[in-house]
Swiss-Prot record:
Belongs to the universal ribosomal protein uS15 family. One of its GO terms (molecular function) is small ribosomal subunit rRNA binding. It comes from Pyrobaculum islandicum (strain DSM 4184 / JCM 9189 / GEO3). GO terms for biological process: translation. It comes from the Archaea. The gene is rps15. Keywords: Ribonucleoprotein, Ribosomal protein. This is Small ribosomal subunit protein uS15. GO terms for cellular component: cytosolic small ribosomal subunit. The lineage of its organism: Archaea, Thermoproteota, Thermoprotei, Thermoproteales, Thermoproteaceae. Pfam families: Ribosomal_S13_N, Ribosomal_S15. HAMAP family: Ribosomal_uS15_A. Residues 1-16 have a biased composition (Basic residues). PROSITE patterns: RIBOSOMAL_S15.
């Protein structure tokens, strides 16, 4: 339950390290961490999941202070690159799930509103990724064409 006069909403969550320096307890070299990242990616884990696995199972709080490179940069260097960035992909999957729900329940107006909100986030992210160069300029969000991602 949330505390009355705090803004945290009562959700538990892990705290990012305040000073991103290499902790003294880490026994892994930068090359070993890089190999762990590549191995986990080849086993099919997305970048966010790799970070969680490294934190929980290997005791590595952050990859960048140890290796000097971001996790996604390591994956790109080893030829493991996602066509669509992970956050955008997750939003697209959510929108496809809501669309499927609306096919069965067309009068569910709350879900229709939720779909509008999710799709506006998708359009904003697409604009950003086109500007930054992570998506090609001709990329267009088309739910029917991207329905193969729902699985």
């Amino acid at each position: 339950m949330p505390h009355r006069s705090r803004h945290k909403k009562g959700r538990s969550r892990s705290v990012r390290p305040a000073h991103p320096t290499v902790p003294t307890w880490i026994q892994y070299t930068p090359d070993e961490v890089e190999q762990l990242v590549v191995e986990l990616a080849r086993r099919g884990f997305p970048p966010s999941q790799i970070g969680i696995i490294l934190r929980d199972q290997y005791g590595i709080p952050l990859v960048k202070p140890i290796t000097g490179k971001k996790l996604t940069k390591i994956l790109e260097e080893h030829g493991i690159r996602q066509e669509i960035p992970e956050d955008l992909l997750n939003l697209i999957k959510r929108a496809l799930r809501i669309r499927k729900h609306l096919e069965e329940h067309p009068k569910d107006m709350a879900s229709r509103r939720g779909l509008q909100l999710v799709e506006s986030k998708i359009h904003r992210l697409i604009k950003y990724y086109k500007r930054v160069g992570k998506l090609p300029k001709e990329f267009v969000y088309n739910p029917e064409a991207l329905s193969h991602l729902a699985t």
